[in-house]
UniProtKB/Swiss-Prot annotation:
Positions in coiled-coil regions: none
Tissue: Expressed in leaves. Low levels of expression in roots.
A molecular-function term among this protein's GO annotations: UDP-glucosyltransferase activity
Pfam families reported in the protein's UniProt record: UDPGT
Record organism: Catharanthus roseus (Madagascar periwinkle)
Protein name as it appears in the record: UDP-glucose iridoid glucosyltransferase
Keywords in alphabetical order: Transferase
Length: 454
């Protein structure tokens, strides 16, 4: 553990350990550091960041009691519960040490919404706290509706209601809510949602979003919570150019050389993110639909992302011979750089919020293949609100896969209109992060807000 030299003050950031949460928290850290704050990142030992990627920060590992714990995707709720029950005491001890023994003055604690134990720590130590929401506002609104339906004893919903719109959350349907509403929701899930949604004594909410995409939802949220909300996203567009990468997974940079040889807007980039998985049947149907589409592709198949498979051994026989040099398979890619490449004309996406923002910022229309949680909500907004993507209605049908790929990648009036909408959003977002823009102004307001803490 090193020491920090306070400039405007010391901010303690408490990220959640998964890639999709760690990335925006470290981006926020870089943004605030560039504004003159010193940064301490208090993280779990499990799935911890690499301190050498950010030598400008102090990193402190919190004992999380996850050694030997089942940390698989199916047990994530228990992982979250274990972290919140075990990390509070160690964080108190660490902060008391640096405040009393080292004389450092902490301006505030900013914690991921999942790491709600940090708010209790802040209250105990009389420190201001703020919560970072790494998803979009619509996802948080969907949680509020789940809690409302639960309080009205509406679960399970009958099949006849699943296609109906959720009141006040158009265009979301009940089946788009981020839990299975056609069955009883376990009490533990409801308890987690209540903790996740409750801002308690947090002084403000920070969002990795922009008024360009969610102005109405942000205004609605402000009226509900009555605390300041700072929409300072997209974070990756606000981060100083010198900031280091935040990926846990080794990136195959050879794919950039391959893209350099492809025609403009010709390549379909495919990735389901750092957590989502598919079964062997979907892999096979996706592969044949892709092969039959005759479109060039860069396909990220993360190791163990296909159930029962180490990597690509379950790809159908003859697939790689059929596509030849038209396609490239990699284990992981430098996604922001890939999406910014002129050869990339489409993104087969799981619709995680980070990926959604990155795709919109590079004006790359999407094929939406959501798997769980906020991805389902994001997909609906991509296809029905911003109208910059296509829904993959049957991912395990090669004919549907082929048709959807062709529909996105082969230029016609619909595809041209979608690309124009993407370009318009990209232009608006670029303006929002420049001087006088909504995100630029919101960041300045956030800096002033933190600096106002005693």
């Amino acid at each position: 553990m090193g020491s920090v030299s306070a400039k405007k003050g010391v901010i303690v950031l408490v990220p959640y350990c998964l890639q999709g949460h760690m990335t925006p928290m470290l981006q926020l850290a870089s943004i605030l550091h560039s504004k003159g704050f010193s940064i301490i990142v208090a993280h779990t030992k499990f799935s911890s960041p690499n301190p050498s990627d950010h030598p400008e920060f102090i990193f402190h590992a919190l004992p999380d009691k996850l050694n030997g714990f089942d940390t698989s995707f199916m047990n994530l709720l228990n992982v979250m519960e274990a972290i919140n029950s075990s990390c509070g005491g160690p964080l108190v001890d660490y902060l008391v040490e640096i405040m009393k023994d080292k004389g450092q003055v902490i301006s505030c604690i900013i914690h991921d919404a999942i790491m709600y134990f940090a708010e209790a720590v802040a209250s105990q130590l009389n420190l201001p706290s703020m919560v970072l929401r790494t998803s979009n506002v619509a996802f948080m609104e969907s949680h509020r509706d789940i809690l409302r339906l639960h309080s009205e004893n509406r679960f399970p919903l009958p099949d006849s209601e699943l296609e109906n719109p959720v009141p006040g959350l158009d265009p979301l349907r009940f089946k788009d809510l981020p839990v299975s509403v056609s069955s009883r929701i376990h009490d533990k899930i409801i308890e987690f949602f209540e903790s996740y949604m409750n801002i308690r004594s947090n002084a403000a909410i920070i969002w990795n979003t922009t008024q360009v995409l969610e102005k109405y939802a942000l205004n609605k949220l402000h009226h509900h919570y009555k605390v300041p909300s700072f929409a300072v996203g997209p974070f990756h567009k606000m981060v100083p150019a010198s900031s280091s990468a935040t990926s846990y997974i080794n990136e195959d940079r050879g794919c950039i050389e391959w893209l350099d040889k492809q025609a403009p807007n010709s390549v379909l980039y495919m990735s389901l993110g750092s957590l989502s998985t598919i079964d062997e049947k979907e892999l096979e149907e996706t592969a044949w639909g892709l092969a039959n589409s005759d479109q060039p592709f860069l396909w990220v198949i993360r190791p163990s992302s296909v159930n029962g498979s180490g990597w690509i051994e379950h790809l159908p026989e003859g697939f790689q011979e059929m596509v030849g040099d038209r396609g490239l398979l990699v284990k992981w890619a430098p996604q922001k750089e890939v999406l910014a490449h002129p050869a990339v004309g489409g993104f087969w996406s799981h619709c995680g919020w980070n990926s959604t923002l990155e795709s919109i910022c590079e004006a790359v229309p999407m094929i939406c293949r959501p798997c769980f949680s906020d991805q389902i909500v994001n997909s609906r907004y991509i296809t029905h609100v911003w109208k910059v993507g296509l829904e993959l209605e049957q991912p395990s049908d090669r004919r549907v896969v082929e048709k959807t790929i062709r529909r996105l990648m082969v230029a016609d009036s619909e595809e041209k209109e979608m690309r124009q909408r993407m370009l318009d959003l990209k232009t608006q977002i670029e303006s929002s992060v420049q001087k006088g823009g909504s995100s630029y102004n919101s960041l300045n307001d956030l800096v002033k807000f933190i600096a106002s803490f005693p």
